[in-house]
Amino acid sequence: GFDYASDCRGTQPFMPVWQGEVIHCPQLPTTLPTLDELLGVGGLNEGNVHERLLELTVNAPPTGHIYTLHAELEGMKLLPVFEKLLTGWRAQGYTITTTRAIFASLDKAALPRCEIVRGTLPGRSGTLMLQGNPYLDRWKLAAA
């Protein structure tokens, strides 16, 4: 099996729950929008889209951010944008690392259990999987 997955959107690493069953494969969700979701929205273009992403990373969550890039965009046509992002993230104090290193640093037993749901995001065509609500939290509140 997989040690971990990074194929949904969310706010922090979590243990996914699907239809009431805990899936024992930690999820390291993408926490930031992709360039193709931002370009052309609200006046964002190749010359300024990096500024929007850097605004979103000014304050780092405790587990950091995970950014998904597309080799055919950031590695080719939008390489200058990606270089600006890397420079900006380093200036913000981030260490560029791998999802494997993030996974290795996690206390897996302490990860929140969250539902995984299908949904949509602005700028993204179709549906994708999203980190949902913490599992059973609404029942814990009702019992309190």
Language-model features: where?
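Alpha-helical scaffold elements lining the catalytic groove of polysaccharide deacetylases
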Residues: 16-61, 80
